[in-house]
Design a protein with these regions (language model features):
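Short, small-residue-rich loop/turn micro-motifs
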Residues: 19, 41, 90-92, 184
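Substrate-binding groove of N-acetylhexosamine-processing glycoside hydrolases
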Residues: 3-6, 12, 64-79, 83-85, ...
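Short, ordered loop/turn segments at secondary-structure junctions
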Residues: 20-21, 223
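Aromatic- and acidic-residue-enriched carbohydrate-binding clefts of CAZyme catalytic domains
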Residues: 1-14, 25-68, 92-116
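Secreted glycan hydrolases and related glycan-binding modules that recognize and/or cleave
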Residues: 22, 31, 264-266
Length: 284
């Protein structure tokens, strides 16, 4: 990490740390040392599956040890990066309010207790001299409580649907999310070849919505759900979409940008390679 951070810094790239600190803690909460901090009892003994790994393993926020542990791992990771930003993640805390924190969630509301824990983490990052970021999926379900979060917290609003609308983003912006990023995706998860048409639609729409609501920027994403079976090189086309659309409001038609990528990135004089790959990825 230190070497990569130095390399990026030399190229003017801000390498921003991103660390699960609330949900998606499969490896941590399956250990003998920390299994007792899992929201759902017995999760550590469940047979392995990619679904279980992704859908469960959220911290029990009613146990004071959970906050101490989260701060500890944030502190250790933070020291490896020179960036002034830190993404604490806190996405997909599916189990929150369903196990150890059920009574607390029934008393206050699941989203409210979520904001309380995220606030603790965000304030810790701020006190450490960094600007905190987090994913939007939980708070976007009940944006009316967004005011409970710290003002300097940057909201990373993700939505990967090809027909994504601006509704959730607008609700967040109108509910007090002053610092927003739009976060589309390159559509490579759970398949061998990325879905390029869907990536074009998703990224171009999110870029347009971000411009309309004066977002801070665009964060293009590539995920490895269920083992990341696709080769990373297949994501290059989606990455180029993100690079092109995030700075230029005059978005090129899909056929034209695919032609340009085919010629400039892959040396295909016919300009058809990306279109052929898109046809290939949609074959049964």
């Amino acid at each position: 990490i230190l070497e990569l951070n130095r390399y990026c810094k030399g190229l003017g790239i801000d390498l921003v740390p991103s660390l699960a600190s609330f949900g998606h803690l499969y490896k941590l909460l399956c250990t003998k040392s920390y299994a007792h901090l899992c929201e759902l009892e017995g999760s550590a003994s469940a047979p392995f599956s990619f679904y279980d790994r992704q859908a469960h393993h959220t911290l029990d926020i009613t146990n004071p040890e959970s906050l101490s542990l989260a701060k500890h791992i944030l502190s250790e990771y933070m020291q490896l990066f020179s960036s002034k930003y830190f993404n604490l993640c806190a996405d997909e805390t599916f189990d929150l309010g369903k196990g150890a924190s059920r009574a607390l969630a029934e008393e206050k509301g699941t989203t409210v207790i979520y904001t309380e824990f995220v606030t603790e983490l965000a304030n810790y990052i701020t006190e450490s001299g960094r600007t905190p970021m987090f994913w939007s999926d939980v708070i976007s379900q009940e944006p009316e409580v967004y005011h409970l979060l710290p003002k300097n917290l940057i909201c990373l609003h993700w939505d990967y649907a090809s027909n994504v609308s601006s509704e959730r983003l607008t609700r967040l912006a109108n509910s007090g999310a002053e610092h927003l990023y739009v976060c589309p995706g390159v559509q490579g998860w759970n398949q061998l070849i990325n879905k390029y048409h869907e990536a074009y639609e998703n990224i171009s729409r999110m870029a347009r919505y971000g411009h309309e609501c004066h977002a801070m920027g665009l964060l293009n994403t590539d995920w490895g759900d269920y083992g990341h079976i696709n080769h990373p090189d297949f994501s290059r086309i989606g990455m180029i979409y993100g690079a092109a659309f995030s700075w230029n409001v005059d978005i090129l038609p899909e056929e034209e940008i695919n032609r340009q990528i085919s010629v400039l990135e892959f040396g295909d004089a016919s300009g058809k390679l990306v279109s052929v790959l898109d046809l290939l990825c949609h074959q049964d």
